[in-house]
Each structure stands twice: as C-alpha cells, then as structure tokens.
A protein has these predicted regions:
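Conserved alpha-helix/loop element of class I SAM-dependent methyltransferases that forms part
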Residues: 22-41
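Conserved catalytic/acceptor-binding region of the Class I
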Residues: 136-194, 208-216
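A short glycine-rich, Lys/Arg-flanked "PGG" loop and its adjoining helix->strand segment in the class I
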Residues: 124-136
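Class I SAM-dependent methyltransferase SAM/SAH-binding core
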Residues: 46-102
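Conserved Class I S-adenosyl-L-methionine
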Residues: 52-54, 182-244
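A short acidic, Gly/Pro-enriched loop at the edge of an enzyme's catalytic core
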Residues: 103-111
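N-terminal, positively charged/glycine-rich alpha-helical extensions of SAM-dependent methyltransferases
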Residues: 1-15
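A short SAM/SAH-binding and catalytic strip from SAM-dependent methyltransferases
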Residues: 110-122
Length: 244
C-alpha cells in the first residue's frame, strides 16, 4: 500500500467526509452495538483509523468512564474528530497520528477499528500481533465481494477495475476459528441515481487510492453499463475476539 498517498487523500477529504460516508457510519454503529453487547464495561480503548470519529463517538457515549486513545494515519482526520468532541470527551481522549500496522496493544482493554483494516498490507497479521499482546479486538473491515457490481462491469468490458484486493471470507473464517473469534458478515448497499455519483462519493471520502500498477480504465465506457444508476454492495465483516 502507498501509505503516503492514502494519508494525503484521506486528509484532503476530511472536511467533507461525513457528507458522503453513509456506509461507514452504519458499519461503525453496528460495530459499536456488538462491542457494547459483548463487553459492557471497558476502561482503556485504543481505536485504529478513527477518521472523523464515527466509531469514536459511539464508544465515548457507551463508556462514559473510559479513556480512549483515538489514532489515524491522517492528521487532518484526527483534527476533524477532535473538532466534534465535547469538552468532557476531549478530557478523556488522547489523539495521535499512527500507522495501525505499528500499533501496540499493551495496556488496553480493547483495540477497535471500523473500516480501516482493508487499507493495511497484512491485516490479519496485525490482528494476530495485537491479539498476542493481550487485548480484546473488535474489527469491522471490508472483504471480498465489496463493489462487486462495479468490478463486474469492468470485467464485462475486459477492463481492470483498480479496486484494492480485499480479504477473502475464507481467510477470515480460518483466522476466527484459530483464535476463537466471533465473526459476523453482512452486506450493506448504497444506491446512486447515476454511476458517476458513486465514483464522486468514493473520491469525496478519500477512498480512491487504486491497486498498485493499475491503469485507469475508460470511465465513460464503464458508466454506460449503468444507464439507470447503480446499487453498490459493501461486504462488511465484524470480528470480535477475547484477550488471550
């Protein structure tokens, strides 16, 4: 992954991210509900890839006595998250710029992350390392099957779609079985009146870094595959695992 490009694009999108990140908000809410149902009491939480704070705010409300360490690769995202916190929330939240692949779980009750791990080079290796450090994990990540409609349109035209490779469901299931984790997978969808609206929305949230070596396809050709708009699928995996 080109971390500098990812950081720059998400940072540039921070000011308008929440206007377009509808799926991200839903996934964060669903993850937060699962976290609180499983672990009603937490004291110290590390959040990786907090973005503008969709999961952050759920955690702060659910655990009013907890200390939260919110981290993100993009400083502008951290600033956007800070700007929406109350004085009480700021008093018990630490904000740090951090690459999730270098995170340390020691001293935390829980490491949580919502829709950030798909940007890591080796997400399951990071999960294994953090879990071995003694923390519980609660991760929501996009998996294979995401953007299936967009990818199929490219395939039908013999074009490369440029979508980053997502984790396969089988890989996640094997990891979950090995570590005694609970795995839940759901499909969320979003409908756009025109296919170009989907392309623009992805850019507006900063999630348009392509797969390495990708050469952009003729966009007009792809858009003509969707004369009546497009409904896009997001396959979201929720992984919850107890501490060792």
């Amino acid at each position: 992954m080109d971390k500098q490009r990812i950081q720059a694009r998400f940072g540039h999108a921070a000011h308008e991210y929440d206007d377009y990140a509808h799926i991200q908000k839903t996934a964060a809410q669903h993850l937060a509900e699962r976290i609180h149902a499983r672990w009603p009491e937490l004291q110290r939480v590390l959040e990786l890839g907090c973005g503008t704070g969709n999961l952050t705010h759920h955690l702060l409300r659910a655990y009013p006595g907890a200390q939260l360490h919110a981290t993100d690769l993009a400083p502008d995202m951290l600033q956007a998250c800070q700007a929406t916190c109350s004085a009480d929330q700021l008093a018990r939240t630490q904000f740090s710029t951090l690459d999730a692949e270098t995170a340390n779980a020691h001293g935390y009750d829980l490491v949580a992350s919502s829709l950030a791990f798909q940007w890591l080079d080796k997400p399951l290796a990071v999960c294994s390392r953090l879990h071995s450090q003694g923390a519980r994990l609660a991760i929501a990540t996009l998996i294979d099957g995401t953007f299936a409609e967009w990818k199929a349109a490219h395939q039908a035209l013999g074009l490369s779609d440029g979508v980053l490779p997502f984790l396969g469901e089988g890989c996640l299931q094997r990891w979950a079985h090995k570590h005694g984790a609970v795995l839940h997978i759901e499909t969320l969808t979003e409908t756009y009146p025109q296919a170009i609206d989907f392309v623009r929305a992805i850019k507006h949230i900063g999630a348009h870094t392509p797969r390495e070596g990708h050469r952009p396809a003729p966009l007009a050709k792809v858009l003509r595959q969707f004369p009546h708009g497009i409904t896009v699928s997001y396959r979201v995996a929720y992984l919850l695992v107890e501490s060792v």
